[in-house]
Amino acid sequence: QVADLIALARRLQEHPEPHALAGKILGLLFMNPSLRTLSSFQAGMMRLGGSSFVVTPGQGTWQVETRTGAVMNAGAAEHVREAIPVLASYCDALGIRSFAEGKDLAADIAETQFRLMADLCNKPFVNMESAMNHPCQALADWKTMDDLAVPRTGRFVLSWVYHPRALPLAVPAATLHMAAQRGMEVVVLRPEGYALPEQVMAKARAAAKVSGGCVGETSDRASALAGAHVLYAKEWGSPECYGDPEAETR
């Protein structure tokens, strides 16, 4: 399936089809900010002859409540249980971006909130970043490596880097799984206390087992970078301090 998607992307890149999605509408619900994801999806629809609409709750539209069973007497005028079916009725496919709440690691790993929203949509559904996944970005990274002729069995280093604030786990989790699924020798380089959750590592190891790749982790920079074909730098918050920003800064 990944190979087919990349082949399609390459064909459209070489032989554009400006009317392929004529008359089609893509709805884009951004519960969280975006630059590249928002602009790339809109540009993609325009290049294929389709159109899109963007809803960012609280910016020109009502705030949207996501909590199940919430009493609607506070700031939000809409609930996702009504909002998503309505938005889906206006489009041919719906993309949703909704980050992790960052409070309960187990709930975020289970994608509890995102699965609820996905279940409310009766149209083709696109994950534009959830608590633990950013599949479209990972797919684009895979294509970029193919375009640059990075060996399928090459060494891929996912390295933690400093950021002033703790960032979500979605991108590192998606990137790790992508490289493992591609069959690469994947190394997660991170300081003590920043090991990715075992569920994330186990999923990547399972993908590597199928693809013929391997997944490891270390805190030793020299050994991790030796012979690397790709260095992917990304910050993520410490799972040990999940839901506690003050502990993270200490």
Descriptions of predicted regions:
Residues 1-43:
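Positively charged, low-complexity intrinsically disordered leader regions
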Residues 25, 30-89:
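Active-site cofactor/substrate anionic-group-binding motifs, chiefly glycine-
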Residues 31-51, 146-233:
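Glycine-rich phosphate/diphosphate-binding loop of Rossmann-like nucleotide-binding domains
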Residues 51-52, 58-59, 93, 124, ...:
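Residue-level detector of anion-binding/catalytic polar loops
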Residues 57-60, 99-101, 130-131, 191-193, ...:
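Short, ordered loop/turn segments at secondary-structure junctions
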Residues 70-74, 101-111, 245-250:
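Short, flexible/disordered intra-domain loops and linkers
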